[in-house]
């Protein structure tokens, strides 16, 4: 076998040079809040010899500076989920960032072409492919605009609005679509496809749900930290300044995969009746007897009533209140001062303290209360999300708590809780269409909600599915009118408003780049072509006259 000869001294010198470059990179202000648990040497060893500069990293830099400015000014980058190139081209005129929703991709753009609700069960490359779809459109419209402007005089350019089509894209990475290696590969896909940032949530991958569905199963705190570390490590290997958004679904979570992390112990539910027995064993025994359906559900309901399901601190407080103790309030305070949502007290430590205060071993068993699938019962909430947000902060650029309602007071509680420990932490907020906005607040409060959240530190806010909903509304409205009044529906409710509002897609040939392509044809054919798309006979000449006929 013929091996390639290599200069060992040069190889070592190149390695040391790269290590020095990485250390210098990490010393930049961009990384002042970022914690890494690996070394520059580790990253240099994982890189190949061919250096590839990804343009998405420039977009990451742009996004970071954008959010830095918003943070300083207490303002907000607010956006919504884009479905296609039409969306991003129109959004670019008014909004300074773009969101790509996994929910929307699941229903409209899976690479399997099979629609689905938001369960993240689509192929792993689905959202990265949508990012690339939109990123290529951004690049194309940017090229098209540049040529059009540079064909103008300076005076004409001065009077022609400039559109920044290259708005940074933040995309949905769900739970990472698997373990650590899957997350590393998924991150690489996003970097290659044009994402400036991605978000990842602390749900278990096999049971992932939309943030506004029931039955969410969390992973332990450290497991999600490992995911965030994997994202940063992958980005470091590929030389990217990718932003990472850590989402927690703990506010409404009801299950967790494991009790391994002591930071989760406060929120894990157990049985307080030693006579209740093991639920999973009871259910398995019933199924072995041929019991299913409503009867099986009844058995679970009866067990739940009997088990006395509680959090451990609730069991301790109930014992103190019901027992023969002097100065009960002082005992409760002594316990809750050391055992609370943000204390990170392990269950072992909490039990020891409870026995010191009550003289009893209070029965509490979280194993017998496990769900049939083996998951532990969990009672999240805002303070749980604060605990997780604080834990994730050193490894993420932004923190996002998924919530059930657009509740300003809850958003403030979360922001205040996180910032009490990490004062300069950036926050993100989902202005979800799953909320009933008109029921939640009056119109005047809706108008100021984004700004009010911005004052709390929510520098990036987004309506996940506005692209889906606005498209559905527009098409439903047009299809309805078209079915009744034919071409009048198009002429009067689509085309004429496009003309009056200056929506450039009315000249869809030009919008799609026909002039730009004609320029390419002329360039490679010596300046003359008889096959120009926008030559004599093009029907868009009709739009030089914009007055509608009545």
Swiss-Prot record:
<feature type="binding site">
    <location>
        <begin position="211"/>
        <end position="212"/>
    </location>
    <ligand>
        <name>substrate</name>
    </ligand>
</feature>
<feature type="binding site">
    <location>
        <position position="172"/>
    </location>
    <ligand>
        <name>Mg(2+)</name>
    </ligand>
</feature>
<comment type="pathway">
    <text>Carbohydrate metabolism; glyoxylate cycle; (S)-malate from isocitrate: step 1/2.</text>
</comment>
<feature type="short sequence motif" description="Microbody targeting signal">
    <location>
        <begin position="548"/>
        <end position="550"/>
    </location>
</feature>
<keyword id="KW-0329">Glyoxylate bypass</keyword>
<keyword id="KW-0816">Tricarboxylic acid cycle</keyword>
<dbReference type="GO" id="GO:0006097">
    <property type="term" value="P:glyoxylate cycle"/>
</dbReference>
<feature type="binding site">
    <location>
        <begin position="430"/>
        <end position="434"/>
    </location>
    <ligand>
        <name>substrate</name>
    </ligand>
</feature>
<dbReference type="InterPro" id="IPR015813">
    <property type="entry name" value="Pyrv/PenolPyrv_kinase-like_dom"/>
</dbReference>
<comment type="similarity">
    <text>Belongs to the isocitrate lyase/PEP mutase superfamily. Isocitrate lyase family.</text>
</comment>
<dbReference type="Pfam" id="PF00463">
    <property type="entry name" value="ICL"/>
</dbReference>
<feature type="active site" description="Proton acceptor">
    <location>
        <position position="210"/>
    </location>
</feature>
<dbReference type="GO" id="GO:0046872">
    <property type="term" value="F:metal ion binding"/>
</dbReference>
<dbReference type="GO" id="GO:0009514">
    <property type="term" value="C:glyoxysome"/>
</dbReference>
<keyword id="KW-0330">Glyoxysome</keyword>
<keyword id="KW-0456">Lyase</keyword>
<feature type="binding site">
    <location>
        <begin position="101"/>
        <end position="103"/>
    </location>
    <ligand>
        <name>substrate</name>
    </ligand>
</feature>
<comment type="subunit">
    <text>Homotetramer.</text>
</comment>
<dbReference type="GO" id="GO:0046421">
    <property type="term" value="F:methylisocitrate lyase activity"/>
</dbReference>
<dbReference type="InterPro" id="IPR040442">
    <property type="entry name" value="Pyrv_kinase-like_dom_sf"/>
</dbReference>
<feature type="binding site">
    <location>
        <position position="247"/>
    </location>
    <ligand>
        <name>substrate</name>
    </ligand>
</feature>
<dbReference type="GO" id="GO:0006099">
    <property type="term" value="P:tricarboxylic acid cycle"/>
</dbReference>
<dbReference type="InterPro" id="IPR006254">
    <property type="entry name" value="Isocitrate_lyase"/>
</dbReference>
<dbReference type="GO" id="GO:0004451">
    <property type="term" value="F:isocitrate lyase activity"/>
</dbReference>
<dbReference type="InterPro" id="IPR018523">
    <property type="entry name" value="Isocitrate_lyase_ph_CS"/>
</dbReference>
<comment type="function">
    <text>Catalyzes the formation of succinate and glyoxylate from isocitrate, a key step of the glyoxylate cycle, which operates as an anaplerotic route for replenishing the tricarboxylic acid cycle. Required for growth on ethanol or acetate, but dispensable when fermentable carbon sources are available. Also acts on 2-methylisocitrate.</text>
</comment>
<protein>
    <recommendedName>
        <fullName>Isocitrate lyase</fullName>
        <ecNumber>4.1.3.1</ecNumber>
        <ecNumber>4.1.3.30</ecNumber>
    </recommendedName>
</protein>
<feature type="binding site">
    <location>
        <position position="464"/>
    </location>
    <ligand>
        <name>substrate</name>
    </ligand>
</feature>
<keyword id="KW-0479">Metal-binding</keyword>
<keyword id="KW-0576">Peroxisome</keyword>
<keyword id="KW-0460">Magnesium</keyword>
<dbReference type="InterPro" id="IPR039556">
    <property type="entry name" value="ICL/PEPM"/>
</dbReference>
């Amino acid at each position: 076998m013929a091996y390639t000869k290599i200069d060992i001294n040069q190889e070592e010198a190149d390695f040391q040079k790269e290590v020095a470059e990485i250390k210098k990179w990490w010393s930049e202000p961009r990384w002042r809040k970022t914690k890494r648990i690996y070394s520059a040497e580790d990253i240099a060893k994982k890189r190949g010899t061919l250096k590839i500069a990804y343009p998405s990293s420039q977009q990451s830099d742009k996004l970071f500076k954008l959010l830095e400015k918003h943070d300083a000014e207490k303002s907000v980058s607010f956006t919504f989920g884009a479905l296609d190139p039409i969306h991003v081209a129109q959004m670019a005129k008014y909004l300074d960032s773009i969101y790509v929703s996994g929910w929307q991709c699941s229903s409209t753009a899976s690479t399997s072409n099979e629609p689905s609700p938001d369960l993240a069960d689509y192929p792993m490359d689905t959202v990265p492919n949508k990012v690339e779809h939109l990123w290529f459109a951004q690049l194309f419209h940017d090229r098209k605009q540049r040529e059009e402007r540079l064909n103008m005089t300076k005076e004409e350019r001065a009077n022609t609005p400039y559109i920044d089509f290259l708005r940074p894209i933040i995309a949905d990475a769900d739970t990472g679509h698997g373990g650590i290696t899957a997350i590393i590969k998924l991150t690489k896909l996003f970097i290659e496809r044009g994402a400036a940032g991605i978000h990842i949530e602390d749900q278990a991958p096999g049971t992932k749900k939309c943030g506004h569905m029931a039955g969410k199963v969390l992973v332990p705190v450290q497991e999600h930290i490992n995911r965030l570390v994997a994202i940063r490590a992958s980005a470091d290997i590929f030389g990217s300044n990718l932003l990472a958004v850590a989402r927690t679904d703990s506010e409404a979570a009801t299950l967790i995969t494991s009790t391994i992390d002591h930071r989760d112990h406060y929120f894990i539910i157990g049985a307080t009746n030693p006579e209740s027995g093991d639920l999973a064993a009871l259910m398995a025994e019933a199924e072995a007897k041929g019991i299913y359906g409503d009867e099986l559900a009844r058995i679970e309901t009866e067990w739940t009533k009997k088990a006395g399901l509680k959090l451990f601190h609730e069991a301790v407080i109930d014992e103190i209140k019901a027992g023969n103790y002097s100065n009960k309030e002082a005992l409760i305070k002594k316990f809750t001062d050391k055992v609370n949502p943000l204390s990170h007290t392990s269950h072992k430590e909490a039990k020891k303290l409870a026995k010191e205060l009550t003289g009893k071993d209070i029965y509490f068993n979280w194993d017998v209360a496990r769900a049939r699938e083996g998951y532990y019962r969990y009672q999240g909430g805002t303070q749980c999300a604060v605990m997780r947000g604080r834990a994730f902060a050193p490894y993420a650029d932004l923190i996002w708590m998924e919530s059930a309602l657009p509740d300003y007071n809850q958003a403030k509680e979360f922001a205040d809780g996180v910032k009490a420990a990490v004062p300069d932490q950036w926050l993100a907020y989902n202005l979800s269409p799953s909320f009933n906005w008109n029921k939640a607040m009056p119109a005047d409060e809706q108008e100021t909600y984004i700004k009010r959240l911005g004052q709390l530190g929510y520098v990036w806010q987004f309506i996940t599915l506005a692209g889906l909903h606005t498209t559905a509304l527009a098409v439903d409205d047009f299809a309805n009118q078209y079915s009744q009044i034919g071409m009048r529906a198009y002429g009067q409710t689509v085309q004429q408003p496009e003309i009056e509002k200056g929506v450039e897609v009315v000249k869809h040939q030009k919008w799609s780049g026909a002039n730009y392509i004609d320029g390419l044809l002329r360039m490679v054919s010596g300046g003359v072509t008889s096959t120009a798309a926008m030559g004599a006979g093009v029907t868009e000449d009709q739009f030089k006259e914009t007055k509608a006929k009545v």
